[in-house]
Each structure stands twice: as structure tokens, then as C-alpha cells.
């Protein structure tokens, strides 16, 4: 599995065309779907950039970006398969934090997210607040996160 962690780190570095100091990644891998998104900090003003903004922010081809992101999703699918093959509990989502020095932390979540009252957007909004302190721009979504977390 260590090799997979290394490949994931290298793929993230390939996807981000500029300098970064820390990456915050959310991956959700189920039997029939996979979603991976991340934010990263840059050295300039400690700015946080959302992964989906890379093509516009760095003038990168959307096709190349989508290909790299698909390859990243496949690595997380492989990681989940490795856990399953090793008779480990099968996780449904995870948070990965990675700093420029290569230090990383993985937090696996084993909740049955399909049975959760939260939809995918709500899970992401809560994750973004807990990990980055970012509230949604939409007022209704912001109120949901505040209410759900009891802020």
C-alpha cells in the first residue's frame, strides 16, 4: 500500500502545475462511484485553490486535467481494493492531508454514507468547513452547515 500512497502523492503533484505547500483531499469510493476533490495552499499569501479551478487558474487544458483527475480516482479505487483484499474494513471515504515535505495523514471513514441523511453536496460542504474553515457562498447552504454543525 505504501507504493499506492507514493503514486497518489506523485499524481497530485502532477495535477497541480504551480507551487503548493499543503493539499487537503476528500475521496469517496463506493462500489459504483468514485469522487475525488481537493484544495491546496500556495506559498503566495497562503491562498487556497480548489482543484476544479486549476484549468482556469493556471490556463491548463481541461482535457489533460480531466485525464489526470481520472487517473487519481483510479488510484483511490485501487487503494480501496487493496484494503478489501487485505481483509481490512472497507472504508467509504477518506481525508488526506499532504504537505510539501511528503508528510501525510490519512483519515478513513467507514460510515455507510448511502444510508446517511446527507447528500454528496452536503457531505462536501461539511468536510470543507471542518478541514478548511470554508463556508459555502450560497446563503441556504451556509445556513445548513452552520445548523448541522451547531456553530
Curated annotation (Swiss-Prot):
<feature type="coiled-coil region">
    <location>
        <begin position="62"/>
        <end position="90"/>
    </location>
</feature>
<dbReference type="InterPro" id="IPR036170">
    <property type="entry name" value="YezG-like_sf"/>
</dbReference>
<dbReference type="Pfam" id="PF04634">
    <property type="entry name" value="YezG-like"/>
</dbReference>
<dbReference type="GO" id="GO:0005737">
    <property type="term" value="C:cytoplasm"/>
</dbReference>
<dbReference type="InterPro" id="IPR006728">
    <property type="entry name" value="YezG-like"/>
</dbReference>
<protein>
    <recommendedName>
        <fullName>Immunity protein YezG</fullName>
    </recommendedName>
</protein>
<comment type="function">
    <text>Immunity component of one of 6 LXG toxin-immunity modules in this strain. They promote kin selection, mediate competition in biofilms, and drive spatial segregation of different strains, indicating that LXG toxins may help avoid warfare between strains in biofilms. Mediates intercellular competition during biofilm formation; disruption of the operon disadvantages the bacteria, but overexpression of the cognate immunity protein restores growth in competition with wild-type. In situ neutralizes the toxic effect of cognate toxin YeeF.</text>
</comment>
<comment type="subunit">
    <text>Interacts with cognate toxin YeeF but not with non-cognate toxin YobL. The interaction probably inhibits the toxic activity of YeeF. May bind with a stoichiometry of 2:2 to YeeF.</text>
</comment>
<keyword id="KW-0963">Cytoplasm</keyword>
<keyword id="KW-0175">Coiled coil</keyword>
Amino acid at each position: 500500500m505504501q507504493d499506492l500512497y507514493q503514486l497518489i502523492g506523485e499524481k497530485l503533484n502532477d495535477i497541480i502545475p504551480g507551487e503548493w505547500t499543503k493539499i487537503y483531499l476528500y475521496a469517496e469510493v463506493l462500489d459504483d462511484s468514485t469522487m475525488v476533490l481537493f484544495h491546496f495552499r500556495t506559498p503566495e499569501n497562503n491562498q487556497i485553490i480548489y482543484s476544479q479551478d486549476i484549468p482556469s487558474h493556471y490556463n491548463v487544458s481541461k482535457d489533460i486535467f480531466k485525464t489526470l483527475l481520472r487517473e487519481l480516482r483510479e488510484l483511490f479505487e485501487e487503494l480501496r481494493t487493496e484494503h478489501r483484499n487485505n481483509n481490512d474494513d472497507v472504508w467509504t471515504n477518506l481525508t488526506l492531508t499532504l504537505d510539501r515535505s511528503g508528510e501525510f495523514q490519512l483519515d478513513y471513514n467507514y460510515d455507510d454514507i448511502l444510508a446517511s441523511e446527507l447528500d454528496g453536496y452536503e457531505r462536501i460542504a461539511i468536510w470543507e468547513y471542518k478541514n478548511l474553515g470554508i463556508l459555502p457562498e450560497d446563503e441556504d447552504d451556509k445556513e445548513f452547515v452552520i445548523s448541522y454543525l451547531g456553530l
